[in-house]
């Protein structure tokens, strides 16, 4: 699959299987296949092909570690789902997964990955999440061909005006407006917008008894950490993983 326009990205299909030896590669169609006993299928950015071939999915150790926070009778939120590696890998352990991804091409790869994996309990949602003051149409700054690092903010640790490849208009809502309940686990990767997402999620967090939150923070965000502390969350660093934290009330 190929994107179009300035700063576009080509994609390939990655079939995750028990045997991780690559049997075939089709450069023309940008597809790699990993034996016929496939389990999950991911449409992933082609510029990261060498990494996927050599090491597998990004953050696969974190994905495996996150399984302990999923429950078959509870829901998971994947906020900043990208191509769905967390959602698809964890869906079988959850009642339902709500995967939020506002960037157009990345959202398409997410939906395609879910469809090719034939997973029925993932709801792909093309909205950005934020605070009440961010509701409406916002500008998403895209700083990478693979869709990673896209942010609503410039002049931050993630993006500045000089490294923005292009922009895209997206619609932002608060998480509370979706009225999702019975949540056990939230994975959040929203590139410096974590505080605003949580501001718009207070009722959701309360109604689900403050689920565990795995999140990325590229800099020490005192406002974010103090906000979580005020909600009685304890925040711990993830050993061996840069900039990743777990917020938990127990």
Feature names for model-found ranges:
Residues 3-250:
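Phosphate/nucleotide-binding beta-alpha loop and adjacent structural elements of enzyme active sites
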């Amino acid at each position: 699959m190929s994107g179009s326009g300035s700063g576009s990205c080509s994609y390939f299909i990655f079939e995750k299987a028990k045997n991780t030896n690559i049997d075939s590669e089709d450069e023309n169609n940008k597809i790699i296949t990993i034996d016929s006993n496939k389990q999950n299928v991911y449409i992933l950015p082609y510029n990261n092909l060498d990494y996927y071939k050599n090491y597998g999915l990004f953050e696969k150790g974190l994905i495996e570690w996150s399984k302990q926070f999923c429950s078959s009778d509870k829901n998971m939120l994947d906020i900043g789902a990208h191509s769905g590696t967390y959602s698809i890998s964890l869906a079988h352990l959850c009642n339902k997964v709500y995967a939020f991804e506002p960037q157009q091409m990345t959202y398409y790869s997410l939906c395609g990955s879910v469809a090719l994996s034939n997973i029925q309990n993932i709801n792909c949602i093309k909205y950005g999440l934020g605070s009440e003051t961010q509701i409406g149409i916002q500008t998403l700054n895209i700083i990478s061909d693979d869709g990673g690092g896209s942010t609503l903010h410039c002049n931050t640790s993630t993006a500045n005006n000089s490294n923005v490849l292009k922009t895209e208009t997206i619609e932002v809502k608060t998480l509370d407006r979706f009225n999702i309940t019975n949540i056990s686990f939230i994975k959040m990767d929203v590139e410096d917008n974590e505080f605003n997402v949580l501001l718009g999620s207070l009722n959701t967090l309360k109604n689900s008894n403050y689920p565990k939150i795995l999140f990325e923070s590229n800099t020490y965000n005192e406002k974010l950490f103090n906000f979580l502390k005020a909600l009685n969350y304890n925040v711990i660093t993830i050993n061996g993983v840069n900039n990743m934290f777990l917020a938990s009330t127990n």
